Swiss-Prot record:
CDD domains: SMP_Mdm34 (cd21673)
Ranges of Polar residues composition bias in the record: 425-441
General function of this protein: Component of the ERMES/MDM complex, which serves as a molecular tether to connect the endoplasmic reticulum (ER) and mitochondria. Components of this complex are involved in the control of mitochondrial shape and protein biogenesis, and function in nonvesicular lipid trafficking between the ER and mitochondria. MDM34 is required for the interaction of the ER-resident membrane protein MMM1 and the outer mitochondrial membrane-resident beta-barrel protein MDM10.
Chief place of localization: mitochondrion
Region named Disordered: 320-339, 348-403, 421-493, 516-537
Annotated protein name in UniProt: Mitochondrial distribution and morphology protein 34
Gene Ontology BP, a term: mitochondrial genome maintenance
Topological relation to the membrane, as annotated: Multi-pass membrane protein
Keyword Isomerase recorded: no
Biased amino acid composition, Acidic residues: 378-391
Residue ranges annotated for the SMP-LTD domain, each copy included: 1-195
Top-rank lineage group of the source organism: Eukaryota
């Protein structure tokens, strides 16, 4: 099968060359240019030459009167040439610094000044060899696809041919640029040129559509808003709006719609979102609202931590408190810890929270004289200071006020110093002496009492056991403080109190007496001699 391939009509048409130069100029300036080229690349001359390419048919896929599809092998080594014109940067230091960040450059002054030189490049002696897929249609034009890189070699002639390294640099750069041009841009250029030859009506449509798209613009002054306001929110006169123009100055930029401004303000006052229907969240501070003029809420002083108090709870219905009456008379709080919440006679002691009060105060030594005084002195003090409390019966829920313990003066303590040596007076005393009489400067507060009913008579056996265990509960018991018989109308709480006090006092005296008998010399004041290792020499 033979084909007649006429090359002369392409080389003789002047309009074809003009159209080809424009397409090549657009294609060369589309991709990023190297930093050395500082101006646009313009195609000044383009000629296909008189030698046509050699085509070899490898495969025919479709053949008809108006279409053709096949695979060809093309070889070209003709006299076609292409001339380009541009401007280049002759100072390599300026080119290097322009392609790097400012903070990494040494910032030279005169050495980095720009020096641009016009450059003219001529491309000739093209040698091409490629496999081409060619598709032709009268309605769609000619489409060519290169299956491999078609460029084998070419000759680059420029203004700097006398400078060897510039010529080599231009040769490498232009060859790489043309390889990309053949693979990407040349098929599109050939397709558009084929449309100009066989389908001129489609060329006119493609040229008109972009122009129409560019011409149609939006004029904001053609249809101004009905409630037009300026930047300050003042209404504008419609006659004044018609006099405005897009190029008239800043007045055209101050034309706003009042509704638009209201909606924009709603967006600003909402949750900083584009949705006007966002539900409002109370007591929330957004980061976008906090500017440099806002108060920094992160440095505010946190709220003071509430003071914590430890409380002790017991199930005992009675409370016994021993306080320092001498300190109360002086108008100060007692430094001795108080005894609170006694559960029963067999329960342990619980100290109050007064151990940290008056920490800087000097500690006083309390000495309790356990020896019994004369009954006459105790009786007179009891008759003068103790009120009658037998007839008063307060409710059980009433709290018991503390029973103060008198504090002896320093002179009395010096005269009545307790010695635990063996003496005839101490041998005549019983093993468990009773607690000393309680003398008070203030009247005693009545204690809760329970009236024993006439019908509520305890059984005989339990009363005998109780009398044997606590002799103080016997009706004929004589009080150690007053010497008078204690009536049966005393409450059980008073009996338990006296029993517990007697038990504790006797236990303390017994332990002291046992320690004294076990080690008689322990309580004597004597100076021990130091051990031999620490004797003075």
């Amino acid at each position: 099968m033979a084909f007649n391939f006429n090359w002369s009509p392409l080389t003789a048409d002047a309009g074809f060359y003009k159209r080809a130069r424009d397409l090549l100029t657009t294609a060369l300036n589309k991709s990023p240019k190297p930093p050395i080229i500082v101006d646009d690349i313009i195609v000044t001359e383009f000629n296909l030459g008189s030698v046509p390419p050699d085509l070899e048919i490898l495969e025919i896929g479709d053949l008809a009167e108006d279409r053709f599809r096949g695979i060809f092998k093309m070889c070209y080594s003709g006299d076609a040439f292409l001339t380009l014109k541009t401007r280049v940067q002759a100072n390599p230091l300026n080119t290097c610094l322009s392609a790097k960040p400012d903070f990494t450059s040494p910032q030279p002054l005169a050495a980095a000044s720009s020096l641009t030189i016009p450059l003219q490049i001529t491309l000739s002696e093209f040698k091409l060899s490629a496999f081409i897929i060619l598709v032709f249609s009268k309605q769609k034009g000619l489409t060519i696809v290169f299956r491999n890189d078609p460029l084998e070699s070419l000759k680059v002639s420029s203004t700097f041919d006398s400078i060897q390294f510039v010529r080599d640099y231009l040769q490498r750069t232009i060859e790489g640029k043309l390889r990309d041009l053949f693979m990407d841009e040349l098929p599109a250029i050939i397709h558009r040129l084929s449309l100009q030859l066989w389908c001129p009506d489609q060329i006119a449509k493609e040229d008109e559509e972009p122009k129409e798209a560019d011409e149609h613009g939006v004029n904001p002054l053609a249809t101004p808003p009905l409630d037009a306001v300026d930047l300050h929110g003042h209404l504008l006169d419609p006659a004044a709006i018609s006099e405005l123009s897009l190029d008239g100055g800043p007045e055209a930029q101050l034309l706003f719609s009042q509704k638009t401004l209201l909606r924009l303000s709603d967006i600003t006052n909402s949750q900083v979102t584009s949705s006007l229907d966002t539900s409002e969240t109370k007591d929330v501070l957004f980061r976008a609202w906090a500017g440099p003029d806002k108060v920094d809420l992160t440095n505010t002083t946190p709220l003071a931590t509430p003071s914590l108090a430890r409380s002790y709870s017991y199930t005992s219905p009675h409370t016994y408190t021993f306080s320092d009456n001498g300190s109360q008379d002086q108008g100060s709080l007692p430094s001795r810890p108080s005894l609170v919440h006694l559960n029963s006679a067999t329960a342990g002691l619980s100290l109050g929270s007064g151990r940290h009060s008056k920490a800087g105060r000097k500690k006083k030594t309390r000495v309790v004289n356990l020896r019994r005084k004369a009954e006459t002195e105790a009786n007179s003090e009891e008759e003068e200071d103790t009120p009658e409390t037998d007839s008063i019966e307060p409710p059980m829920s009433e709290p018991i006020m503390p029973h103060p313990i008198l504090e002896e003066s320093d002179e009395e303590l010096a005269s009545n110093k307790v010695h635990f040596g063996r003496s005839p007076d101490l041998q005549q005393q019983p093993r468990r002496p009773s607690f000393r009489a309680q003398a008070t400067n203030a009247p005693e507060v009545p204690v809760p009492s329970v009236e024993l009913g006439k019908t509520a008579v305890p059984p005989l056996q339990s009363s005998e056991k109780q009398a044997a265990r606590f002799p103080s509960q016997d009706p004929a018991f004589v009080d150690s403080k007053t010497g008078r018989p204690r009536p049966r109308s005393d409450t059980s709480s008073v009996i338990l109190e006296q029993a517990w006090i007697m038990k504790m006092a006797g236990e303390i005296a017994r332990r002291v007496y046992d320690e004294k008998n076990g080690n008689p010399t322990f309580w004597d004041d004597q100076d021990d001699t130091p051990p031999p290792a620490y004797e003075a020499r």
